[in-house]
């Protein structure tokens, strides 16, 4: 019986250990190396990830899941006032970030532990596997997986908690609808603070699909976006219609066809 997304993920790791999990620009990471990285990561407490869209952000999210906690990705461009409102409401136990973003707010003021990736020596990290496994054994499928923040149009952003079961159901529906076979190369254009990113993450974990992290800025440069899709051989996208309309209106597919894209 599957109780968390980690159960699916570890099945995938066993099945395709050397398959590419995530690519970003010239960086890439296999499923096996994820396990190695995640083994050193810090029940059911929110942990903020304040990083740009990157492999480090994906690894942080999965590391938080492995520690049986809840990840909440925040935009590094978030205004300070909005960020402070989120932190006050969320009360995270920790923030994972880097030198460039660690001083955006005074984390200590809110009782948040700062984990600076630029200061971590992975060779000195140790893991209590017995403790982690004990936590895993206590998980149930209605435990929270991640938190997504609303736009905050009413003044204060609200945190929406999504549990494991909701992703089980979503991926099951998507699998029945699109017939995923694990050979998908997903062009992930949405920011990591959007819910669709979490769905793409689960497709990677559940089905063994590869995620290609596309810079969100490419959305306003359709030709460059299509060139990137060609270069990375992307065959699955889940985008807002606006981008597709722009591509169609400019007739870009006639010049930059995407033959590998699934219909």
Where are these regions (language model features)?
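Carrier-protein-dependent adenylate-forming modules in NRPS/ANL systems
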Residues: 1-165, 178-179, 208
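Short hydrophobic "strand-cap" motifs at the C-terminus of beta-strands
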Residues: 25, 74, 147, 189-190, ...
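His-Asp-centered acyl/peptidyl-transfer active-site segments
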Residues: 42-45, 182, 188, 256-260
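Adenylate-forming
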Residues: 52, 99-103, 190-193, 217-218, ...
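Acidic donor-binding helix in nucleotide-sugar-dependent glycosyltransferases
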Residues: 56, 63, 184-185, 200-203, ...
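Structural signature of beta-strand start/N-cap positions in the alpha/beta core
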Residues: 56, 70, 146, 185, ...
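Conserved helix-loop-beta element of the AMP-binding
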Residues: 91, 109-120, 167, 186, ...
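Conserved AMP-binding/adenylation subdomain of ANL enzymes
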Residues: 158-185, 195-236
């Amino acid at each position: 019986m599957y109780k968390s997304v980690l159960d699916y993920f570890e099945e995938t790791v066993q099945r395709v250990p050397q398959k590419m999990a995530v690519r970003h620009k010239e960086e890439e990471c296999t499923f096996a190396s994820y396990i190695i990285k995640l083994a050193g990561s810090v029940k059911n407490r929110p942990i903020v990830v304040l990083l740009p869209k990157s492999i480090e952000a994906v690894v942080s999210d999965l590391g938080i899941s492995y520690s049986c906690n809840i990840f909440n990705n925040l935009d590094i461009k978030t205004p300070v006032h909005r960020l402070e409102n989120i932190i006050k409401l969320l009360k995270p136990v920790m923030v994972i970030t880097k030198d460039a973003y660690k001083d955006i707010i005074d984390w200590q003021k809110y009782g948040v532990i700062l984990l600076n990736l630029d200061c971590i020596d992975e060779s000195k990290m140790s893991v209590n596997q017995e403790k982690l496994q004990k936590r895993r054994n206590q998980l149930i499928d209605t435990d929270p997986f991640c938190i997504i923040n609303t736009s905050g149009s009413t003044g204060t952003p609200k945190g929406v908690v999504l549990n494991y079961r909701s992703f089980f159901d979503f991926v099951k529906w998507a699998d029945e609808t699109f017939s995923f076979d694990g050979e998908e190369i997903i062009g992930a254009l949405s920011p990591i603070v959007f819910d669709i990113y979490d769905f793409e993450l689960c497709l990677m974990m559940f089905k063994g699909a590869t995620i290609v992290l596309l810079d969100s800025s490419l959305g306003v440069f359709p030709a460059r976006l299509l060139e990137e899709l060609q270069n990375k051989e992307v065959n699955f996208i889940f985008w807002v219609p606006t981008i597709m309309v722009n591509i169609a209106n400019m007739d870009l597919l006639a010049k930059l066809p995407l033959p590998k894209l699934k219909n």
